């Protein structure tokens, strides 16, 4: 009490500082799911790796654009039999026309950059969904632990009633032993649920970088209703998964153009300056000319490269079409599962309510000797199992909303409640 009086009259910030100095724990602020996701994404290695790959692709675009600039080749050194004399060969070449070969390389590098930028969004959504799933795992585990504890309290009440009934001579010891057995099973279940909770908390700490405390149950809006009022085809086309597949096809298309252009001669303007031995004497010379240059041919392989590139383009286009269909199929499956879970949740809620009513009725009948302990334990077990399943269904319905949002790149908007504003 003396320590508390010292804190009276001090500002709130100073009081908190005093509590820290005294070792008194302060209650941690509640962590909503969007804050947990932001904290986890800031330290997620896969997201950072994808971002580094996108940055590298941007550098590759600048490298490809270097094909528009002149190339310089230079060599030099002492003359073969006269070390005091230096010979050299300097050539500067500027591409004038290459049938779109350099442009195709730039287009391919740019499409690769866009593809990897979409890969960053995909990696971000995957990482965010992993954090969301773990967040919900912790919430579900905490609720299951609390449900088991309430179940144990009800079993303790039944055991006390059984003891009182046995001490009055209305029942033998078998009823008490049966109640103790059911209580031991509940204690074992509590240990299992605590272990699951600890595992979920450890996973959360690894992903988010801090221990879970005061988690807030999220209330995501129905993505099915949002998509029903939107252009689903457009949403799928604009999803990172679909755009990534489309950009892969764009890369393949640019590679087809590059392969075809490589079969044709490239027109260069070349200027050379050299010093070499002619007739036993070192001579300097300079030349400027127009030249056609082609890649080295090795059998028929050069002619087969456009065919291979065209085949890859066809494969990439089919993959993009398959991705669009797969996203639509995944959404439909998730929404169908959500409807089924909602119906089951309504049924289980009714079961829990009826189990509570039957339990109270059986308790009253047990007190007057019209029911034995087996009836009480059975109805309590049925209520407990229904409550556990109800927790799983309730959390699973929320998972479905987030999984569906991740499929179409709307997970961030769903977490931040921006879908209500027509995002």
Task: State where each predicted segment sits.
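Bacterial N-terminal signal peptides
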Residues: 15-25
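Small/polar-residue-enriched beta-strand and adjacent coil segments characteristic
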Residues: 32, 71-123, 243-255, 260-323, ...
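Bacterial Sec-pathway N-terminal export signals of envelope proteins
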Residues: 28-77, 96, 104, 170-173, ...
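Outer-membrane beta-barrel domain signature
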Residues: 79, 83-85, 188-191, 195, ...
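Amphipathic alpha-helical coiled-coil segments
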Residues: 49-64, 123-152, 157-160, 164, ...
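Periplasmic alpha-helical coiled-coil/stalk elements that build and connect Gram-negative outer-membrane
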Residues: 5, 31, 126-240, 248, ...
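N-terminal secretory signal peptides that target proteins for export/translocation
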Residues: 1-11
């Amino acid at each position: 009490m003396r320590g508390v009086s010292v804190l009276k009259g001090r500002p709130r910030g100073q009081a908190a500082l005093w509590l820290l100095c005294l070792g008194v724990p302060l209650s941690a602020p509640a962590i909503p799911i969007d804050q947990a996701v932001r904290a986890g994404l800031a330290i997620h290695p896969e997201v950072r790796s994808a971002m580094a790959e996108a940055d590298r692709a941007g550098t590759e675009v600048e490298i490809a654009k270097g094909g528009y600039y002149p190339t310089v080749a230079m060599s030099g050194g002492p003359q073969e039999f006269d070390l005091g004399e230096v010979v050299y060969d300097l050539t500067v070449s500027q591409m004038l026309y290459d049938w779109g070969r350099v442009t195709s390389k730039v287009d391919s590098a740019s499409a690769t950059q866009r593809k990897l930028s979409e890969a960053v969004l995909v990696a971000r959504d995957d990482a965010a969904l992993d954090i969301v799933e773990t967040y919900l795992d912790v919430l579900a585990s905490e609720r299951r632990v609390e449900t088991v504890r309430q179940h144990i309290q009800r079993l303790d009440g039944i055991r006390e009633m059984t003891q009182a009934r046995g001490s009055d001579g209305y029942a033998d010891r078998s009823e008490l032993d049966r109640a103790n057995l059911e209580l031991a099973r509940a204690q074992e279940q509590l240990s299992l649920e605590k272990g699951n909770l600890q595992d979920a908390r450890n996973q959360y700490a690894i992903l988010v970088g801090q221990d879970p405390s005061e988690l807030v149950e999220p209330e995501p809006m129905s993505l099915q209703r949002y998509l029903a009022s939107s252009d689903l085809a457009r949403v799928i086309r604009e999803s990172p998964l679909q755009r990534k597949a489309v950009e892969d096809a764009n890369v393949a298309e640019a590679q087809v153009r590059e392969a075809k252009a490589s079969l044709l001669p490239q027109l260069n303007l070349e200027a050379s300056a050299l010093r070499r031995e002619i007739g036993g004497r070192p001579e300097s010379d300079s030349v400027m000319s127009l030249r056609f240059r082609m890649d080295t041919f090795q059998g028929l392989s050069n002619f087969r490269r456009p065919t291979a590139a065209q085949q890859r383009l066809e494969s990439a286009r089919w993959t993009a079409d398959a991705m669009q269909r797969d996203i639509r199929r995944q959404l439909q499956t998730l929404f169908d599962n959500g409807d089924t879970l909602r119906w089951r949740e309504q049924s289980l809620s009714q079961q829990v309510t009826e189990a509570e009513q039957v339990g109270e009725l059986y308790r009253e009948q047990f007190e007057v000797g019209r029911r034995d302990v087996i009836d009480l334990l059975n109805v309590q077990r049925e209520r407990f199992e229904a409550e556990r399943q109800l927790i799983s269904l309730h959390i699973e319905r929320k998972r479905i909303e987030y999984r569906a949002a991740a499929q179409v790149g709307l997970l961030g908007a769903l977490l931040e409640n921006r879908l209500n504003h027509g995002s």
